[in-house]
Curated annotation (Swiss-Prot):
Entry GO MF terms: ABC-type phosphonate transporter activity; ATP binding; ATP hydrolysis activity
Membrane topology label: Peripheral membrane protein
Keyword presence, Membrane: yes
Keywords tagged on the record: ATP-binding, Cell inner membrane, Cell membrane, Membrane, Nucleotide-binding, Phosphonate transport, Translocase, Transport
Organism: Shigella sonnei (strain Ss046)
Primary localisation category: membrane
GO cellular component: plasma membrane
Subunit structure: The complex is composed of two ATP-binding proteins (PhnC), two transmembrane proteins (PhnE) and a solute-binding protein (PhnD).
Protein name: Phosphonates import ATP-binding protein PhnC
Record EC number: 7.3.2.2
Length: 262
């Protein structure tokens, strides 16, 4: 099975606090993987390293690859990082869309990487590109909002627009950081259904950080759980039982309660 993401010996320190400890991880083509863990466990930090938004410590042997290309090595971004980013769609808790633009215009932004520079300066997109953008919006159930300003949409609708933009980008990997954290249950379900649909039907590899364990168990076949910057569990969601849940979350809560009491 093709390895899409490879992480070796990744460490990260913030203000003398070790957020990640020599993390090693392989993610394969077509997987939908949930990153779980308590607040401060390092799951969002790990995801941001995969995207090249932040760099790790300058540790010997640390290395991140995405689609066979180096993202960063020993604390330095690869010179051709843009080539990795061109194949990666990003979805964040804070909706990273342009509020003053329409839904369709936001989705067309996904085509910028494959559009000649002079066209991007004037936002000149071809008829074929606009048709593909409408098809992407149809996939996520948002085509009827195509000419509406993004700022008028609900949180769940904005997340679906972000997914449509990743489809427009023809991303091979989607990295989603807490995409349902601020959504109501019905909107969260729709967003997760959409991610699973493109994973299963388009073969797009999806890595998603979640606080909601029930969504991880329902939608993701594999769980990678982090605890205090270490990989605590990496395996099937079916084997992530109550005992592992207790060790991952409740023991951390007891440590925090004891610290407050002291």
């Amino acid at each position: 099975m093709q390895t899409i993401i490879r992480v070796e010996k990744l460490a990260k320190t913030f203000n003398q606090h070790q957020a990640l400890h020599a993390v090693a991880l392989n993610i394969h083509h077509g997987e939908m993987v949930a990153l779980l863990g308590p607040s401060g466990s390092g799951k969002s930090t790990l995801l941001r390293h995969l995207s090249g938004l932040i760099t790790g410590d300058k540790s010997a042997g640390s290395h991140i690859e995405l689609l066979g290309r180096t993202v960063q090595r020993e604390g330095r971004l690869a010179r051709d990082i843009r080539k990795s980013r061109a194949n990666t769609g990003y979805i964040f808790q804070q909706f990273n869309l342009v509020n003053r633009l329409s839904v369709l215009e936001n989705v067309l932004i996904g085509a910028l990487g494959s559009t000649p520079f002079w066209r991007t300066c004037f936002s000149w997109f071809t008829r074929e590109q606009k048709q593909r953008a409408l098809q992407a919006l149809t996939r996520v159930g948002m085509v009827h909002f195509a000419h509406q300003r993004v700022s008028t949409l609900s949180g769940g609708q904005q997340q679906r627009v972000a997914i449509a933009r990743a489809l427009m980008q023809q991303a091979k990997v989607i990295l989603a950081d807490e995409p349902i954290a601020s959504l109501d249950p019905e909107s969260a379900r729709i967003v997760m259904d959409t991610l699973r649909d493109i994973n299963q039907n388009d073969g797009i590899t999806v890595v998603v950080t979640l606080h909601q364990v029930d969504y991880a168990l329902r939608y993701c076949e594999r769980i990678v759980a982090l605890r205090q910057g270490h990989v605590f569990y990496d395996g099937s969601s079916q084997q992530f039982d109550n005992e592992r849940f207790d060790h991952l979350y409740r023991s951390i809560n007891r440590i925090e309660e004891n610290a407050k009491a002291a």
